[in-house]
């Protein structure tokens, strides 16, 4: 499949508008509204031009920096592509970023104009404004935001856009299109960092061009697809994926609030979505729980359908073999009846492709998703590689548990400590203002050091763990915590888990229960409790969870298995510094915050 449009990001939307005209490009909800609305390619293109003109009118110049501090929304895309049109670099901030984080990024990135989403983001921006010498204006997407008294720097997006409404500077904009270079910087993406060290990854238009071309060869997205956003546009996975889908003429459905994703899916019936493994873990838990509670006949039918789906989609298709005619016919019937009902409950009547990355994917979950007829494409990537390094190629055989084959532009080398090293046109030139770090992150042959351990086998890449996250027990055994944690996260009673093992005699875990279900279980078993603290301290509850964990970890070597657990009465959170903006756990912070609880598990 050839990419339908090959364009520099500065003119991509306008070229697509010339091709698709009044077809729907974007579907979204306005802030505070429950009603879905649509924008055509022509309208999208006009808005982008208006943003380019308005930016010039407030004084933006080529190579200036703007930042977007917002949830996903239609204005986000207008702003990004409007900036690209005049060679302005756009820096995305996570909507959940703290004042301290945005102040650091604004100053490090020398941001002149900050676009914010809702009240929370505006309030934080207003409070740090005086501490950010480069910052000149705050432009607010949501018109219902209350602007602080005497804030001459603030401007609503609806008023900002009027400055470019009649395209007063379009001649200058067109001239800037002509001078667009692949070497210009499109974005600086600040990594949230599991160690707390935030670095600005420089991404050029050339990297985007190479990434779009390489992904286009292996990801079957077309103008027929309806693609819903789940991850924030700040996340390189969602950003790269959204741009790929737009470049193919697909309709983009913008989901603003992650907690509404399942409701949104049932309303708009997407064919594609990128996500992290936790989304599919929760789907797996919910579907399995529903079927286990169903009547015996229904339960039997479901598990038979799952077995047929597994045989056809994994034993044959994934292994590059053609299914026998009898199996194909049985699958056709089961797929149209039972499996389609399961997918319908998710809003996925016509699933096409569902890229999944960002954390370790449990083989159990991957098998389940493929078995019910959803094209999950497991992959691996980094901000520094502009997302995809490797992914499952659905037209080739693949192994459950791998992260697929490298995309065409990437060279992979396995270095010391089994570190994955990368080279190619999608790889960053380095971190903004970090010359010392940049000198260390590339080897003598120019390969980028990922910090991830892995290995190649039969052309496929397998991940082991972040090197800095690998634990070594006091007995000298290595533990990959993410793999152990992913086994536990498929249990309906477990919400969060942090494995402990470094320099310890055995493996233990801090566990945050799924409180609603554990509370129900406790009541059914006549266990009295007056608080979550009571529940977490209860020996029967701990015994029940330890027994379930023992079942889940049977496949692990004995030294990898969790021997003791501590239940925590509250969640790991971003506010406490225990989670990154991408919801990965910060192990050093967790070790520090729960030092007493951890030490207690190792008392003789």
Each model region followed by its residue ranges:
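Conserved pre-ATP/AMP-binding loop-to-beta segment of ANL
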Residues: 21-24, 139-140, 161-190, 197, ...
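Conserved structural elements of the adenylate-forming
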Residues: 49-50, 182, 201-222, 230, ...
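Conserved AMP-binding/adenylation subdomain of ANL enzymes
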Residues: 209-226, 233-336, 350
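Conserved C-terminal "lid"/linker of ANL adenylate-forming enzymes
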Residues: 471, 496-499, 505, 542, ...
């Amino acid at each position: 499949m050839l990419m339908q449009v090959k364009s520099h990001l500065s003119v991509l939307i306008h070229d697509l508008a010339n091709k698709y005209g009044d077809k729907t490009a974007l579907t979204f909800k306005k802030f505070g509204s429950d009603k879905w609305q649509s924008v055509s390619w022509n309208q999208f293109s006009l808005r982008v031009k208006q943003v380019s003109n308005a930016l010039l009118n407030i004084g933006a110049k080529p190579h200036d920096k703007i930042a977007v501090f917002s949830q996903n929304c239609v204005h986000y895309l207008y702003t990004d592509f409007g900036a690209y049109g005049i060679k302005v670099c756009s820096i995305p901030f996570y909507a959940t970023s703290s004042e301290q984080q945005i102040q650091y990024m604004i100053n490090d990135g020398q941001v002149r104009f900050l676009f914010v989403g809702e009240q929370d983001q505006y309030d934080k921006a207003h409070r740090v404004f005086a501490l950010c010498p480069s910052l000149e204006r705050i432009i607010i997407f949501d018109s219902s935001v209350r602007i602080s008294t005497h804030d001459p720097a603030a401007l609503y997006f609806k008023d900002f856009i009027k400055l470019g409404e009649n395209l007063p500077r379009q001649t200058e904009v067109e001239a800037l299109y002509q001078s667009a270079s692949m070497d210009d910087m499109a974005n600086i993406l600040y990594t949230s960092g599991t160690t707390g060290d935030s670095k600005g990854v420089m991404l050029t238009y050339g990297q985007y061009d190479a990434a779009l071309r390489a992904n286009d060869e292996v990801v079957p997205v077309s103008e027929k697809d309806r693609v819903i956003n789940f991850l924030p546009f700040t996340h390189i996975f969602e950003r790269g994926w959204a741009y790929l889908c737009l470049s193919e003429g697909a309709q983009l459905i913008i989901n603003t609030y992650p907690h509404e994703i399942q409701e949104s899916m049932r309303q708009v019936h997407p064919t594609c979505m990128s996500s992290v493994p936790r989304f599919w873990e929760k789907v797996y838990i919910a579907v399995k729980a529903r079927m286990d509670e169903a009547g015996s006949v229904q339960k039997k039918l479901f598990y038979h359908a799952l077995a047929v789906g597994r045989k056809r989609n994994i034993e044959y298709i994934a292994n590059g073999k053609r299914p026998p005619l009898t199996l194909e016919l049985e699958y056709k019937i089961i797929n149209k009846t039972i499996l389609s009902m399961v997918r319908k409950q998710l809003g996925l009547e016509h699933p096409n492709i569902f890229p999944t990355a960002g954390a370790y994917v449990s083989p159990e979950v991957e098998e389940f998703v493929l078995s019910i007829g959803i094209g999950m494409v497991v992959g691996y990537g980094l901000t520094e590689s502009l997302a995809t390094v490797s992914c499952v190629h659905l037209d080739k055989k693949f192994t459950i548990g791998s992260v697929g084959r490298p995309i065409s532009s990437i060279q992979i080398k396995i270095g010391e400590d089994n570190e994955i090293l990368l080279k190619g046109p999608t790889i960053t030139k380095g971190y903004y203002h970090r010359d010392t770090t940049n000198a260390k992150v590339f080897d003598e042959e120019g390969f980028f050091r990922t910090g991830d351990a892995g290995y190649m086998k039969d052309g496929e890449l397998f991940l082991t763990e972040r090197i800095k996250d690998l634990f070594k027990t006091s007995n000298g055994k290595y533990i990959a915590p993410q793999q152990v944690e992913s086994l536990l996260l498929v249990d309906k009673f477990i919400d969060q888990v942090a494995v402990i093992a470094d320099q310890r005699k055995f493996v233990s875990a801090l566990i945050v229960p799924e409180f609603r279900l554990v509370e129900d279980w406790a009541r059914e078993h006549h266990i009295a409790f007056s608080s979550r603290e009571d529940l977490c301290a209860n020996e029967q509850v701990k015994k029940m969870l330890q027994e379930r964990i023992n079942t889940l970890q049977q496949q692990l070597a004995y030294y990898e298995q969790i021997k003791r657990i501590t239940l925590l009465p509250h969640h790991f959170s971003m506010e406490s510094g225990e989670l990154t903006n991408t919801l990965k756990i910060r192990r050093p912070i967790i070790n520090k915050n729960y030092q007493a609880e951890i030490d207690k598990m190792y008392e003789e």
